[in-house]
Amino acid sequence: FMQSIEKHDYVISIISDNYLKSRNCMYEMLEVVKDSNFSQRLLFIVLTNEDAKYYKVAPIQDIGADVYSVSGQAKYSKFWSQMDKELDSEIEEIGNSIYAINQIKEKKIIQKILLDLPDFLEFVRENKGLSLTEHLENGFADMISFMEL
């Protein structure tokens, strides 16, 4: 993923509730945001539940990413904290850390997400990604302007 981003002028990221709860998505995005060369080329579409109307098949669950409120941001911190606790339980159940190597590696990744999550959410909030509905209503003018097209 990182190598493919280097080849592009801009990266448009669609942020949904599931995205913010995906280990792979969060791990990669947190790496991208740390690199100022990449972070200056990132554009966000922050999905709201209203944006589900554009799906061909209605999503089973809410898609909206609650990144603009403190309580919404806390929801994602709690989610990743719970993942961390579940790994602690698995490691404890296994008993010997030699046999829990995969769980320990996963725990390191989850802890990295937990550590970097507040900065990422603040980055998204400061860069005010519009919803898909807002982008469609204004013809993606903000993105076009950002990319100086």
Outline where the language-model segments fall.
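Short beta-alpha junction loops
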Residues: 17-18, 39, 44-54
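C-terminal interaction surface of TIR/SEFIR-family domains
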Residues: 49-149
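Conserved N-terminal substructure of TIR/SEFIR domains
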Residues: 1-11, 33-41, 138-149
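Conserved TIR/SEFIR loop-to-helix hotspot centered on a Trp-containing motif
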Residues: 17-37
